[in-house]
From Swiss-Prot:
It comes from Shewanella halifaxensis (strain HAW-EB4). SUPFAM superfamilies: Radical SAM enzymes (SSF102114). Catalyzes the methylthiolation of N6-(dimethylallyl)adenosine (i(6)A), leading to the formation of 2-methylthio-N6-(dimethylallyl)adenosine (ms(2)i(6)A) at position 37 in tRNAs that read codons beginning with uridine. This is tRNA-2-methylthio-N(6)-dimethylallyladenosine synthase. Residues 143-375 form the Radical SAM core domain. The gene is miaB. Monomer.
Length: 475
């Protein structure tokens, strides 16, 4: 009987990526298969997030539920990873004796050894260190799960915004070597992946080493990835305004694989609040980036992050944020009420905006952006959109579901042979959370560019060392 693994994941897309790597790692090295049922698992892993309020209490509530499973099954192994694990360390074990493993985002690759130590009789293993890029060297080859894939290009953040825990929980910025990223994407393309989303806490700070000890910028990386045959759509998340340089904007002008959609967090439209947040830019600088982007790519849509009720946020500060929203005309946002994160500089500021005021401002902001998003959706009616077909429609399995460049779900009638491929559809109707399309043409009628075959990369340049680590080595 195969061993079973259950992973519960909270938080950002990076955590989702990390959890998928944990599953691949334990499958390859330990033979574990994933299960959605915690009661039948041999190993339970909780991948935590410390961004939201009461993150620690949420963790201990979950561990309390899992303790009852361990009481019935003493050999059950329970592990806690992610940002709360990185923050709290051994304090988790002191409060929850049922926990066997505590590991940070940079040490998840050591899970097989940690599990072996517990099996050998060790009472607890705690490793929340920051071993830089070693994590990526030890992970198994990627496995495609559908036509779209996330690829981590860097870890950590060095910006130290006053409200954010990321530099303390994931460490400072560390970029993966260019060749490793290209090889991973080529391997995914060989498995049928058509869309890649480059992932990091601050992707546009990417500065990866090349095989000849030069430095590859983020703009250069985008062009390298776009040239790989089969990768016909390219996204990235998340970026920071202060490093959204002109060379990145230039890629939008000449690289059609890069989608006409950008998530660029701003957090506030008030210069005073931006200064308090230590964001390193003013509202006018943010608007300048968007203006230059729209000159390079007129149809680009923008989404952002907003924190509502930051300490000291006055009615005028909030009005400045709403003015920025009106000026930019955002298509989407992730917006939250401010709550202090322990250990951050902002936690020492007086939280002087009432909860009722925060809720009212949040509702106003979200309503405005929802209206703007619906307007953009209605403007798409009658247009032909290229979508990547992800699978059957959720509500009607006899239909298909795909996604536009600007991340809208489109349902349409079509043949299942189109799953995993691009099709063109005409948008004929708009709903709250999706669009309705009519099939126009399939991929065989498109003139998709072919530059660099993935097999040329994986076959010619792949080198594997004695430890089984594969690297991309240009000849």
């Amino acid at each position: 009987m195969s061993k079973k693994l259950h992973i519960k994941t909270w938080g950002c897309q990076m955590n989702e990526y990390d959890s998928s790597k944990m599953a691949d790692l334990l499958d390859e090295y330990e033979g574990y298969t994933l299960t959605d049922n915690a009661e039948e698992a041999d190993v339970l892993l909780l991948n935590t997030c410390s961004i939201r309020e009461k993150a620690q209490e949420k963790v201990f509530h979950q561990l309390g539920r899992w303790k009852t499973l361990k009481d019935k099954k003493p050999e059950l192994i329970i592990g806690v990873g992610g940002c709360v694990a990185s923050q709290e360390g051994k304090a988790i074990k002191e409060r929850a004796q049922c926990v066997d493993l505590i590991f940070g985002p940079q040490t998840l690759h050591r899970l097989p050894e940690m599990i072996d130590q517990i099996r050998a009789g060790k009472k607890a293993v705690i490793d929340v260190s920051f071993p830089e890029i070693e994590k990526f060297d030890r992970l198994p080859e990627p496995r495609a799960d559908g036509p779209s894939a996330f690829v981590s290009i860097m870890e950590g953040c060095s910006k130290y915004c006053s409200f954010c825990v990321v530099p303390y929980t994931r460490g400072e910025e560390v970029s993966r070597p260019l060749d490793d990223i290209i090889l991973e994407i080529a391997q995914l393309a060989e498995q049928g992946v058509r869309e890649v989303n480059l992932l990091g806490q601050n992707v546009n700070a990417y500065r990866g080493a090349t095989h000849d000890d030069e430095i590859c910028t983020f703009a250069e990386l985008l062009r390298y990835v776009a040239a790989i045959d089969g990768i016909d759509r390219l996204r990235f998340t998340t970026s920071h305004p202060i490093e959204f340089t002109q060379d990145i904007i230039d890629v939008y002008e000449d690289t059609p694989e890069l989608v006409s959609f950008l998530h660029l967090p701003v957090q506030s439209g008030s210069d005073l609040i931006l200064t308090q947040m230590k964001r390193g830019h003013m509202a006018i600088e943010y608007k300048s980036i968007i203006r230059r982007l729209r000159k390079a790519r007129p149809d680009i849509l923008i989404s952002s992050d907003f924190i509502i009720g930051f300490p000291g946020e006055s009615k005028q500060d909030f009005a400045d944020t709403m003015k920025l929203i009106e000026d930019i005309q955002f298509d989407h946002s992730f917006s939250f009420i401010y709550s202090a994160r322990p250990g951050t500089p902002a936690a020492d500021l007086p939280d002087d905006v009432s909860l009722d005021e925060k809720k009212e401002r949040l509702a106003i902001l979200q309503d405005r952006i929802t209206q703007q998003a619906m307007r953009y959706s209605r403007q798409m009616v009658g247009t032909v959109q290229r979508i990547l077909v992800e699978g059957p429609s959720v509500k009607n399995p006899m239909e298909l579901r795909g996604r536009t460049e600007n991340s809208r779900v489109v349902n349409f009638e079509g043949m299942h042979k189109h799953i995993g491929k691009f099709v063109d559809v005409e948008i004929v109707d708009v709903y709250t959370n999706s669009l309705r399309g009519v099939f126009i043409r399939g991929e065989d009628e498109m003139d998709l560019r072919r530059d660099l075959r993935p097999s040329d990369i994986t076959a010619k340049y792949k080198q594997t060392d004695d430890l089984g680590v594969s690297q991309f080595k240009p000849a």
